[in-house]
A protein has these predicted regions:
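Intrinsically disordered, low-complexity terminal regions
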Residues: 1-327
């Protein structure tokens, strides 16, 4: 036991010693570009963060902090200077790209952090690996690709987002196309959502108007649905919609090995077409005027719910190896 404690102590002291010996070297690059209306900014970065800040003039100002870490100051400087940043202006488009020269080092590191001040009407196209992206507001079409990093977006009008092995937190977006895998997704208010999700640990939407999704190995939770939700190929997953607006138009789900929970109440009026193979259909307090049939291992229910004899809204759920809950 004493020998084990001594070994652990020596390892800890070695780790502390190597950390204490690490030196940091920083250098900055600042470039300013004059642009016209609706300029474009395209950035491709890795091993660092991208921050977009809204400015008040017709300029795009790019500030890049390059950081090197090494056992000596000379090593740290050499690692920082082994990062190249190419910034250019072509017409009304600013482009930036970082490249890292290949070097072999021990107990060292490099990073490139961007802070970019842009006009409000800028069109953004951002890509980052091994780092986060921060955007307060995007009034023009936005394209973001982030891998091994997180996206924090406050507000956007139209956005195309690809995220993998990270997280995406989007507070508000009118039209969002989101493709994600092995990530955590948190959405606030979205007008229209389309996309694919696979192996996402968290996928939560506070409020959505219309959504069209394909999902695999992901639990999707929608707190409130206003108009329509179409989920195709819900495989080894789950869908839970907490609250559905009375004036909704459509819910359509094709599921396998997944449970489907829809927050429908006796106050809703809709046409139901439900089929559960190797599963059950649970209607709760709903009064569905329906023909409830069973064929082999398949339960089927077709009919209408609510006061209207010919309701406009439609609920269609086809499931295999999973239950359907309308309550």
């Amino acid at each position: 036991m004493k020998r084990m404690l001594l070994t652990v102590l020596l390892v800890s002291l070695c780790a502390m010693g190597s950390t204490a010996a690490k030196k940091v070297y920083r250098r900055q690059i600042v470039k300013e570009f004059s642009v016209g209306a609706r300029p474009e900014l395209a950035l491709s970065n890795c091993f660092g963060e991208i921050r977009i800040v809204e400015g008040a003039d017709r300029k795009i100002t790019v500030r890049v902090e390059l950081r090197g870490e090494g056992k000596t100051e000379e090593e740290a400087r050499r690692y920082a200077e082994a990062v190249n940043v190419d910034l250019s202006l072509s017409g009304n488009r600013v482009e930036g790209r970082t490249t890292f020269q290949k070097i072999i080092c021990n107990n060292c590191g490099r990073a490139a952090d961007f802070t970019v001040t842009v006009p409000r009407d800028v069109v953004l196209s951002l890509a980052n690996q091994f780092g986060n992206i921060y955007i307060n507001r995007a009034t023009q079409p936005l394209t973001v690709t982030v891998k091994y990093g997180d996206l924090y977006l406050k507000e956007a009008s139209t956005a195309l987002v690809n995220v993998s092995f990270g997280k995406a937190s989007i507070d508000r977006c009118a039209m969002l196309n989101l493709n994600s895998q092995y990530s955590g997704i948190t959405l606030g208010t979205v007008g229209q959502l389309t996309g694919k999700t696979k192996f996402d640990g968290t996928y939560r939407i506070e409020s959505v108007g219309r959504c069209t999704l394909t999902a695999g190995y992901t639990q999707i939770r929608i707190d409130r649905l206003s108009e329509s939700c179409v989920v195709d190929k819900l495989r080894f997953s789950g869908l839970r919609i907490g609250e559905v607006a009375r004036g909704f138009s459509e819910i359509s789900v094709k599921a396998s090995y997944s449970e489907v929970h829809l927050g429908l109440t006796p106050g809703h009026a809709f046409r139901a077409d439900l089929s559960a193979s190797y599963g059950q259909i649970h209607t709760g307090d709903l009064n569905i005027r329906a023909a409830d049939t069973r064929s082999g291992r398949t339960n089927q229910l077709s009919g209408t719910a609510g006061a209207s004899e010919s309701p406009r809204a439609r609920v269609s759920v086809t499931s295999s190896f999973g239950d359907i809950y309308l309550k």
